[in-house]
Amino acid sequence: MSELSQALTDCGALQFGEFTLASGAKSDYYIDIKKASTNPEVLRLIAKLMAEKMRSEGIQADRIAGVVLGSVPLATALSLETGIPYVMIRKEKKDHGTGKLIEGDLHEGDKVLVVEDVITTAGSSIKAIHTLREAGAEVSYVISVIDREGGGAENLRDVDIKFRPLVKASELVKR
């Protein structure tokens, strides 16, 4: 078992039972990644592994992007680990404040790495990628903590995104 798989198991992120996922699919296990992203030791490990993935894959980024809410701690931690600024992507505009979909400084032509907690179908990631591209950003990569292997990799490939998970669900849930 990898160091990350062990850390996710130890912090209680991996749960077994009957669950409905954000995609609507049913599952006999659930990965409560917020148990990991609110644990400083596990969050630090995730940031370190994401930074290593960036280096090993040669991923260059001017900005890191996290989708509100679940991916923001990951984007923050990776930003602190790498020194790369981050932006937050809202799922929908708010009717108060600035009403922006993208919070933080983003400039046309910026290379943006999207980070995600768990990818199943990649629906929310693809929406965020479209939002970033409409703002003039270049998005080529998504790094996630978990790939639930629910078609997300293929869906991301369809929008010209290279997907790099830290761990696949099939590796994590081996019992």
Regions found by a protein language model. Give the residues of each.
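PRPP-associated nucleotide enzymes
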Residues: 1-115, 119, 123-175
